[in-house]
Amino acid sequence: MTFSLRFTADLIFALAARAITNKNGFPFILQLSPDTDFDTGAAALSASMPRVDNGSSQSSTLVPRYRSPILWISGSEPLDHPEVPRFTNALAASGRHVFLQTSGASLKRRLHEFQPSSRFYFAIHFDGLDPLPDRSSACDAPFRVGIEALRMARLAGFFTCAHLVVRPGAEDSKLEELHAEISKLDVDGFLLTRSALSPELERNVNRLRRRLLSRRWALLSDLVESVALPAASRNSRQTGRQPLSESQPDNFEEGAEAG
């Protein structure tokens, strides 16, 4: 499972940029939510940006104001917002790496609105799910929805990753089973993040990353976690952040790595 050369280069750059704010005044990874960010930005972008005929059903491409190289789109459920596909396509076309987190429940009816791109990933969210529940149980529904969403997106030519959220008390064996089950779909990668600020949970997640993820996906998981954690947790986390070793960029060459 590999990244594109451009994405690999951007992740290497993250090793130098992660401890400080970018000199241009924007973070390396920016979290956006259609609940709060897209509605207010749409009017301004539509009024100020030229319309470009891209030969598709989408009448224009909006060049975004967001300068961060990686954009993480999340929220209650991004696919419930009608403007998300247009914004996502425009952000990816502008040169940003875009990750759209979704449960996958609405993906079947919205998939045709998105454009495959080497800069765009569907990040299917698996939060505290038992990977092998009783198949006759209702609790299996979210897991099956996520699996089907990954399968649909892959068949349609999109890059995909599974975002596994680790909660306190989660068993390593369960996460490993979930990772193995999803790996059968030949997804492009995995993100592994914790649900809350906890030293014990952090140790557990770091151990799982070393065991299950490549260095690139482990780094991206850490970057995503820095914006996905609750605000209070992020502030405390940044205070105690330790920089990665300068020797680590050498470990980010292209190659087939697990996770």
Where is each model-derived feature located?
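Residues at alpha-helix caps and immediate loop-helix transition turns in enzyme cores, especially N-
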Residues: 41, 55, 83-84, 174-177, ...
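A C-terminal junction/extension of Radical SAM enzymes
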Residues: 195-259
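Radical SAM/AdoMet-radical enzyme domain recognition
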Residues: 59-73, 81-194
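N-terminal/domain-start segments enriched in small and hydrophobic, helix-friendly residues
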Residues: 13-22, 31-35, 88-98
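Membrane-proximal basic amphipathic "stem/tether" segments
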Residues: 1-25
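Short, histidine-centered active-site or binding-site loop motifs used for metal coordination
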Residues: 36, 48, 126-130, 194-196, ...
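Canonical Radical SAM [4Fe-4S] cluster-binding loop centered on the CxxxCxxC motif
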Residues: 18-58, 65
